Protein backbone atom coordinates (compact mmCIF):
# COMPACT_ATOMS: atom_id res chain seq x y z
CA UNK A 1 0.00 0.00 0.00
CA UNK A 2 0.96 3.57 -0.56
CA UNK A 3 2.07 5.70 2.35
CA UNK A 4 -0.49 8.29 3.42
CA UNK A 5 0.52 11.90 2.90
CA UNK A 6 1.18 13.85 6.11
CA UNK A 7 -1.89 15.78 7.24
CA UNK A 8 -0.20 18.25 9.56
CA UNK A 9 3.09 18.52 11.27
CA UNK A 10 4.68 20.13 14.27
CA UNK A 11 7.77 20.35 16.36
CA UNK A 12 8.61 19.66 20.00
CA UNK A 13 11.54 21.51 21.57
CA UNK A 14 13.20 20.26 24.75
CA UNK A 15 15.33 22.59 26.85
CA UNK A 16 17.03 22.41 30.21
CA UNK A 17 20.21 23.27 32.06
CA UNK A 18 22.53 21.09 34.10
CA UNK A 19 23.61 22.92 37.26
CA UNK A 20 26.18 22.26 39.97
CA UNK A 21 23.72 22.44 42.86
CA UNK A 22 22.32 20.06 45.48
CA UNK A 23 18.76 20.43 44.10
CA UNK A 24 16.92 20.77 40.85
CA UNK A 25 14.05 23.22 40.44
CA UNK A 26 10.53 22.17 39.54
CA UNK A 27 9.67 23.38 36.01
CA UNK A 28 6.41 24.97 37.21
CA UNK A 29 8.31 26.88 39.90
CA UNK A 30 10.93 28.14 37.45
CA UNK A 31 8.35 30.04 35.38
CA UNK A 32 5.08 30.87 37.10
CA UNK A 33 2.36 33.52 37.03
CA UNK A 34 0.42 34.87 40.00
CA UNK A 35 -3.06 36.22 39.21
CA UNK A 36 -4.41 38.93 41.53
CA UNK A 37 -7.65 39.43 39.62
CA UNK A 38 -9.48 42.68 40.30
CA UNK A 39 -8.16 44.85 43.14
CA UNK A 40 -10.06 47.83 44.60
CA UNK A 41 -8.57 51.22 43.70
CA UNK A 42 -10.14 52.78 46.83
CA UNK A 43 -8.62 50.10 49.05
CA UNK A 44 -5.12 50.67 47.64
CA UNK A 45 -5.41 54.48 47.75
CA UNK A 46 -6.36 54.24 51.43
CA UNK A 47 -3.15 52.34 52.21
CA UNK A 48 -4.61 48.86 51.99
CA UNK A 49 -3.37 45.88 50.07
CA UNK A 50 -4.86 43.12 47.96
CA UNK A 51 -5.71 39.70 49.28
CA UNK A 52 -2.38 37.89 49.79
CA UNK A 53 -1.47 35.34 47.13
CA UNK A 54 0.78 32.48 48.15
CA UNK A 55 3.32 31.05 45.76
CA UNK A 56 5.94 28.37 46.16
CA UNK A 57 9.34 27.63 44.73
CA UNK A 58 9.78 23.87 44.74
CA UNK A 59 13.23 22.33 44.75
CA UNK A 60 13.40 18.73 43.61
CA UNK A 61 15.62 15.69 44.14
CA UNK A 62 17.83 17.43 46.70
CA UNK A 63 20.92 15.54 47.84
CA UNK A 64 21.63 17.49 51.02
CA UNK A 65 23.48 14.66 52.75
CA UNK A 66 26.32 14.68 50.21
CA UNK A 67 26.27 18.49 50.07
CA UNK A 68 26.83 18.64 53.84
CA UNK A 69 29.70 16.13 53.52
CA UNK A 70 31.45 18.80 51.43
CA UNK A 71 31.35 21.11 54.45
CA UNK A 72 28.22 23.02 53.43
CA UNK A 73 25.38 24.05 55.74
CA UNK A 74 22.60 22.55 53.61
CA UNK A 75 20.53 25.73 53.38
CA UNK A 76 19.23 27.94 50.60
CA UNK A 77 18.30 31.60 50.24
CA UNK A 78 17.19 33.54 47.19
CA UNK A 79 17.88 36.87 45.57
CA UNK A 80 15.20 38.56 43.48
CA UNK A 81 15.74 41.18 40.81
CA UNK A 82 13.33 43.49 39.05
CA UNK A 83 12.35 47.14 38.78
CA UNK A 84 12.30 48.35 42.38
CA UNK A 85 9.56 50.52 43.87
CA UNK A 86 11.11 52.03 46.96
CA UNK A 87 13.34 49.69 48.93
CA UNK A 88 11.21 46.57 49.20
CA UNK A 89 8.59 46.43 46.46
CA UNK A 90 8.49 45.49 42.78
CA UNK A 91 7.24 48.25 40.45
CA UNK A 92 4.46 47.19 38.10
CA UNK A 93 4.34 47.95 34.39
CA UNK A 94 1.48 50.17 33.29
CA UNK A 95 0.00 53.38 34.65
CA UNK A 96 -1.86 52.05 37.68
CA UNK A 97 0.63 53.27 40.30
CA UNK A 98 0.79 49.85 41.94
CA UNK A 99 3.65 47.77 43.27
CA UNK A 100 4.04 44.20 44.47
CA UNK A 101 5.19 43.39 48.00
CA UNK A 102 6.61 39.88 48.40
CA UNK A 103 7.30 38.32 51.80
CA UNK A 104 9.79 35.50 52.27
CA UNK A 105 9.13 32.37 54.38
CA UNK A 106 10.08 34.35 57.50
CA UNK A 107 7.57 37.16 56.76
CA UNK A 108 10.31 39.59 55.74
CA UNK A 109 9.86 41.85 52.69
CA UNK A 110 11.90 40.72 49.69
CA UNK A 111 14.19 43.30 48.10
CA UNK A 112 14.36 43.31 44.29
CA UNK A 113 17.93 44.61 44.04
CA UNK A 114 19.40 41.31 42.86
CA UNK A 115 21.80 41.27 45.82
CA UNK A 116 19.93 41.19 49.14
CA UNK A 117 19.14 37.57 50.01
CA UNK A 118 15.94 36.33 51.59
CA UNK A 119 15.97 34.53 54.90
CA UNK A 120 17.67 31.15 54.90
CA UNK A 121 15.66 27.94 54.58
CA UNK A 122 17.04 24.58 55.72
CA UNK A 123 16.99 21.80 53.15
CA UNK A 124 16.25 18.10 53.52
CA UNK A 125 16.97 15.24 51.13
CA UNK A 126 14.27 14.89 48.47
CA UNK A 127 11.87 17.71 47.63
CA UNK A 128 11.75 21.08 49.41
CA UNK A 129 9.16 23.83 49.06
CA UNK A 130 9.90 27.47 49.87
CA UNK A 131 6.77 29.52 50.56
CA UNK A 132 6.29 33.18 49.60
CA UNK A 133 3.36 35.60 49.83
CA UNK A 134 2.64 38.48 47.43
CA UNK A 135 0.39 41.54 47.85
CA UNK A 136 -0.53 44.45 45.58
CA UNK A 137 -0.06 47.87 47.17
CA UNK A 138 0.09 51.52 46.16
CA UNK A 139 3.57 52.32 44.84
CA UNK A 140 5.96 54.85 46.37
CA UNK A 141 5.43 57.60 43.76
CA UNK A 142 2.90 59.49 45.87
CA UNK A 143 0.38 59.45 43.02
CA UNK A 144 -3.08 57.96 43.41
CA UNK A 145 -3.70 54.46 42.10
CA UNK A 146 -5.43 54.51 38.71
CA UNK A 147 -7.62 51.94 36.99
CA UNK A 148 -6.12 49.58 34.45
CA UNK A 149 -4.12 46.42 33.99
CA UNK A 150 -0.77 45.89 35.70
CA UNK A 151 1.98 43.33 35.55
CA UNK A 152 5.45 42.86 36.94
CA UNK A 153 8.28 40.40 36.41
CA UNK A 154 10.85 39.35 38.97
CA UNK A 155 13.72 36.97 38.38
CA UNK A 156 15.18 34.88 41.17
CA UNK A 157 18.46 33.12 41.85
CA UNK A 158 19.02 30.35 44.35
CA UNK A 159 22.01 30.59 46.68
CA UNK A 160 23.00 27.36 48.36
CA UNK A 161 25.07 27.47 51.54
UniProtKB/Swiss-Prot annotation:
Disulfide pairings: none
Stored PANTHER family: FIMBRIAL SUBUNIT, FIMBRIAL SUBUNIT ELFA-RELATED
Biological processes annotated in GO: cell adhesion involved in single-species biofilm formation
Keyword Secreted annotated: yes
Family according to the record: Belongs to the fimbrial protein family.
Protein name: PRS fimbrial major pilin protein
Reported function: Fimbriae (also called pili), polar filaments radiating from the surface of the bacterium to a length of 0.5-1.5 micrometers and numbering 100-300 per cell, enable bacteria to colonize the epithelium of specific host organs.
Domain of life, source organism: Bacteria
Species in which this protein is naturally found: Escherichia coli
Cellular localization per UniProt: Secreted; Fimbrium
Chief site of localization: secreted
UniProt keyword list: Fimbrium, Secreted
Pfam family, one: Fimbrial
A GO cellular-component term linked to this record: pilus
Name of the coding gene: prsA
Amino acid sequence: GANAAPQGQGKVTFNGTVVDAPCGIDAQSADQSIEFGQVSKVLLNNGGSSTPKNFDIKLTDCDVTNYKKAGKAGTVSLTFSGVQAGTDMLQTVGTTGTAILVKDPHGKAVKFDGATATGVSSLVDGDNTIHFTALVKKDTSGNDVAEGAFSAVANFNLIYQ
